[in-house]
Each structure stands twice: as C-alpha cells, then as structure tokens.
Amino acid sequence: MKTLCSFLQISRNMHQENQTTITEFILLGLSNQAEHQNLLFVLFLSMYVVTVVGNGLIIVAISLDIYLHTPMYLFLAYLSFADISSISNSVPKMLVNIQTNSQSISYESCITQMYFSIVFVVTDNLLLGTMAFDHFVAICHPLNYTTFMRARFGTLLTVISWFLSNIIALTHTLLLIQLLFCDHNTLPHFFCDLAPLLKLSCSDTMINELVLFIVGLSVIIFPFVLIFFSYVCIIRAVLGVSSTQGKWKAFSTCGSHLTIALLFYGTTVGVYFFPSSTHPEDTDKIGAVLFTVVTPMMNPFIYSLRNKDMKGALRKLINRKISSL
C-alpha cells in the first residue's frame, strides 16, 4: 500500500510539475444530514461485520473440509476473499469519517482506494464467469470433471483473474494520475470510485472514458456470455435428468451462483455503463452500495442456505468450535 502511494506521488509530480493541483478530496458520503450519520454508522458497521464473518466462515469451512477441496468450492473461497477485500477497501474509511466528523481523504489514498476498488470488482466479475464454466463442466460433462477441472487448473484460472484485474486497474490508474483536478475536490460518493473522479477532473477525459467503456465492456461481456451459454447448456442437461432429487441438487448449486451473478451484473452495469445524465447521483450511490456492500454480504447467506454441502461444512465447523469450548 505504501509502495503504491509513493509511486503515485512520484508519477503525479512528473506529470503535473509546475501546475496547481489539489492534495485531498472531500467524500460527501451517503447523506449530508447530521441526524443520519449515527444510523449510517450502525448500519454499515453491522453489514461490514456480517460480511467479514460470513465470508470468513466460508473460507475456513472450505479450508478445513477436505471433501470441499474441489475447484467449485475453491472458487467460492476465492470469491469470499475478494468480497471481504472489496468491502474492507471502502466501508472502514467511511466509518472513520463518520466517527471523526471528517470527510477528507488524501490524493494518494483516494487513488489507491480507487485502484483496489477496480481490482476487486473485476476479480469478482471474472470469478463469477469462471464458476459458471466450472458448473457447466460438472453438470454437462460429469465424467470428465475430475480430469479437466483439476486443482492446479482451478488455481491457474484464479491467478489469471487476479493478474488481469491488476493490469486493468493499473491502466485506469496511470491514465487518471495524468489528469488535473484544479479547485474541484468534492466527491458526491462514499468512496473514491473511477466514474465520479473522471467527472471531477478539469482535464479532457475523453481517452479515460473511452478506455473505461471499451475495457469495462470487454470485462463484462466475456464472463456474462460465458455465464449465459453455460446456464443454457446446464438447464438443458438438468431438464433431461429423470431424478427429481438430481434436478433439485443441480438447480440449488447453480441457483446460488446465478443469484449472485444477476445482482452483481445488474448493479455494475447500471452504475458504470448508463449515462449519469439519465439518473440522479443518488442512484449511482445506491448501485455502488449494492455491488460493494450488499452483494458481498449476501454471498455467504445465498451459498450456505441453498447448498447442502456448504451447510454441512458450516455445521461441522460450528459444532467443532462449540465442543472445544
């Protein structure tokens, strides 16, 4: 984190030498009303704790249960880690600002927060596509699943997802630090996100917006198409199964993933790809809350309540902790 901040400061000095620029941003948060701050603090602290504990339990349960050491559940563990990281990137700073009655964040910290925000959103997106492909192989080609989806191959897909997300985040960051922000430093948001930062700049942002659209659309379309065609094949395969129990198991496994995917894509596309002029800024905030806070919080509930194997693993983990007391 410190290395990235130092790099940003050096790069900024090189690109903006002899030009007057701001040194901090003001995050307006979700509400300007003083009477709402305590409610927001309690609400988001509760959601943060639930998200960290819930996703943490999924990671621990999968790690300790040898029967869940398959790519399907390892992808879920990686998704849970990305969700914990995503909400930890934005909510703690917001809670600190509420408690200290301070809305400021330094330029370097803001750009760093934006960088990791992009990393975790893109990683979530790519992992959802990877999980859909894994479900497709498991249900449509069950005899070849253990041969094709080996642990090493699953790890490789995860590493590729993290690598691509960092490359994309670095591209946006390097383009952003070349922009000037002049005297405008007020962000109508609760964290430093790319879209509102571009609106705030007094430089020409055409290249930034073009890259955001092209790269963002590519990152969205490929996993979405993979998810769509995977589930078309899965539904056709499941409908051909004569066993009612087999159909229910397949739909319960895939239904959890599909629910998370629809919630994630719906809010992400709404925030980043629809023109801001067509809806108020509050809509962007609500969308950002949904995919950075609500979706990570819902992840453990949706997967644990609809998946028999996860419920069993969590039950064993809880019983083990109780018996050790």
Swiss-Prot record:
PROSITE patterns: G_PROTEIN_RECEP_F1_2. It comes from the Eukaryota. Its main location: membrane. It is found in: Cell membrane. Belongs to the G-protein coupled receptor 1 family. SUPFAM superfamilies: Family A G protein-coupled receptor-like. GO terms for cellular component: plasma membrane. Disulfide bonds join 110-202. GO terms for molecular function: G protein-coupled receptor activity; olfactory receptor activity. Odorant receptor. This is Olfactory receptor 1S2. It is a multi-pass membrane protein. The chain crosses the membrane at residues 39-62, 71-92, 114-133, 153-171, 209-232, 250-272, 286-305. Keywords: Cell membrane, Disulfide bond, G-protein coupled receptor, Glycoprotein, Membrane, Olfaction, Receptor, Sensory transduction, Transducer, Transmembrane, Transmembrane helix. GO terms for biological process: signal transduction. PANTHER family: OLFACTORY RECEPTOR. Residues 63-70, 134-152, 233-249, 306-325 are cytoplasmic. Residues 1-38, 93-113, 172-208, 273-285 are extracellular. Glycans are attached at residue 18. Pfam families: 7tm_4 (PF13853).
